[in-house]
A protein has these predicted regions:
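Hydrophobic/aromatic packing residues within the alpha-helices of TPR/SEL1-like helical repeat arrays
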Residues: 395-396, 429, 462, 496
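Alpha-helical transmembrane segments of multi-pass inner-membrane proteins
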Residues: 8-26, 36-55, 59, 63-96, ...
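Hydrophobic alpha-helical transmembrane segments in integral membrane proteins
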Residues: 198-213, 361-390
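Interfacial juxtamembrane loops and adjacent helix segments
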Residues: 233-275
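Alpha-solenoid helical repeat scaffolds
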Residues: 407-411, 440-445, 473-478, 508-513
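Internal/C-terminal transmembrane anchor helices
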Residues: 183-199, 350-373
């Protein structure tokens, strides 16, 4: 029975690790991210439900430390498989100019997984006395570092440098006995490695770095408007692009105009939650991420495996959006559960918890299944929306479920517009604006108003889209057509000259067609 329990535990842990690297599943609107979340949440909820029922029946559960060790081994194994797949892709198709992604959505996501896996592999190697396993885990760590460099992720490189500094300092602590010399050596090693890394990061992809700085400046302005309570749920998505448009109206010749794009996240988790929920949110997030270090400093040695993986998530939180991915929640959640295990044990002694936990996990599992089914229906409606009138009926059935989802409302509005139902499209795009304001929304709103012959409103929306992303040509094309339809030759010719003189950021056939049309 014990062997069967261990086998089942290993299978569950392997599935959880596999869910983090799940390849695209083209059954949902987001083929890369949503399947990972559904599989991960379903496995965790089902496991939690069965574990809670087993505890209620008095059956023993696996030891937490053993489960953690097994998870580390499984995660290292699955990450090795991912890296080997990256190698296969390189051999087959060559190096990607923008960095390797493997089965994941972008290089930063792969870099995050590797930055979590590297310290785990090193820990397993250092904690194993058998030379065979020491060599295997050491080789895995080297493979992870090599693939991390191939992702070209600057945040991953910073994280790797900081891990290297910590490792060198620990090595110096063991080899150098004199405290004064040890401190000098710490400082020299840290400064040399960190300075070299930051110099490379600053000189690499300078346009992207400038764009990030611009986004953070506008985001700080939003946070400063409501520092205590924030702008509310989805506040960043509602307010940021409006703030970006205001900036370019005031600074039409700004150097950032060529860099501006549709933005959904400030590339900083702390700023993101601050804009949405106020100053308390980033403070709580920071405390959650430093909780393992605090517990370890208080003498809790069980927190040691979590220190560098959670530190990697902390670094990525400053430059990216790691909490979009299941691996960040798994790592931080496991660390928090381990840190608060004494509190949880006391709570588990209450009889009510024995019945609440199975019900809670059952509800989570049910919610995940329902959401997956509805997302699949949305994906099916989207695929058929351009050739099947019945797809709009399915959109309407889904509206009550997704009525607060701006991506669904935009998709439904676009489908209605393409099918010629302009009144419904106008209602939906207005409803979408309650949750999200962005370039694509303004552009579609302009097209809808233009087809409804509401030309003044169309001009307002096209001008808003122009201000949000000055580098784009589509809003100017919309303005040109509106002025042509209304017979305003002076403004039409002014827009034509603007299109002719406008610099092109990314060349495409669509842009050349616009330029030819407006000659």
């Amino acid at each position: 029975m014990k062997a069967n329990g261990q086998s089942l535990s290993s299978i569950v842990l392997a599935l959880i690790c596999f869910s983090c690297y799940l390849p695209p599943v083209y059954l949902f609107t987001d083929a890369r991210l949503l399947p990972k979340w559904y599989l991960c949440v379903a496995i965790l909820a089902a496991t939690g439900m069965f574990a809670a029922v087993a505890r209620l029946r008095g059956k023993p559960l696996p030891d937490g430390r053993g489960v953690m060790t097994s998870f580390c081994k499984m995660f290292t194994t699955v990450t090795v498989m991912e890296c080997l797949w990256v190698v296969v892709c390189i051999v087959k198709d060559g190096l990607r100019p923008v960095g390797e992604v493997g089965t994941l959505g972008n290089p930063a996501e792969l870099a995050l997984h590797l930055c979590i896996a590297i310290p785990i592999a090193v820990m397993l190697a250092m904690g194993n006395r058998k030379r065979k396993w020491l060599a295997l885990y050491g080789a895995a760590a080297i493979l992870f570092v090599a693939v991390l460099l191939l992702t070209q992720s600057r945040t991953g490189l910073i994280c790797l440098a900081l891990d290297g500094i910590i490792g060198l300092c620990l090595l110096a602590h063991r080899l150098v006995r004199r405290k004064g010399l040890r401190c000098v050596l710490y400082g020299v090693l840290a400064l040399a490695l960190l300075a070299g890394t930051l110099l490379y990061v600053a000189s690499h992809k300078t346009a992207s770095t400038s764009g990030r700085a611009f986004i953070l400046q506008r985001s700080w302005e939003l946070a400063a408007e409501h520092p205590l309570i924030g702008h509310g749920h989805r506040g960043f998505e509602r307010e940021y692009m409006l703030r970006q448009a205001d900036f370019f109206r005031e600074h039409p010749g700004s150097e950032y105009a060529m860099l501006a794009d549709e933005i959904h996240h400030p590339l900083n988790e702390f700023v993101h939650v601050w804009v949405n929920y106020g100053i308390v949110a980033p403070l709580l997030l920071f405390l959650l991420l430093v909780l393992p270090l605090w517990r370890w400093r208080r003498g809790d040695r069980r927190m040691r495996p979590f220190l560098l993986p959670v530190f990697a998530i902390l670094v990525f939180s400053c430059f990216s959006y790691p909490f979009y991915y299941p691996i960040a929640w798994l790592t931080v959640g496991a660390a928090a559960l381990c840190a608060l295990r004494s509190v949880l044990r006391r709570w588990q002694k209450h009889a009510a918890s024995s019945y609440i936990l199975p019900l809670f996990f059952f509800l989570v599992l049910g919610a995940a299944v329902v959401d997956a089914v509805q997302e699949h229906r949305w994906h099916r409606a989207y695929r058929h929306s351009f050739r099947d009138v019945a797809a709009l009926e399915e959109y309407e059935e889904l509206h009550s479920y997704f009525k607060r989802n701006p991506a669904f409302l935009y998709s439904y509005a676009m489908a209605s517009f393409k099918r010629g139902d302009l009144d419904r499209a106008a209602r939906l795009i207005e409803e979408c604006g309650q949750h999200w304001n962005g370039y694509n929304r303004e552009l579609l709103a302009g097209d809808i108003c233009s087809y409804r012959e509401e030309y003044p409103d169309a001009i307002v929306h096209y001008e808003a889209a122009c201000a949000m992303c000055p580098v784009r040509f589509a809003p100017l094309e919309g303005l040109y057509k509106v002025y042509d339809l209304t017979g305003d030759e002076e403004r039409r010719n002014a827009i034509a000259r603007q299109i002719a003189d406008k610099d092109i950021k990314v060349y495409s056939s669509a842009i050349w067609q616009i330029k030819e049309m407006c000659k």
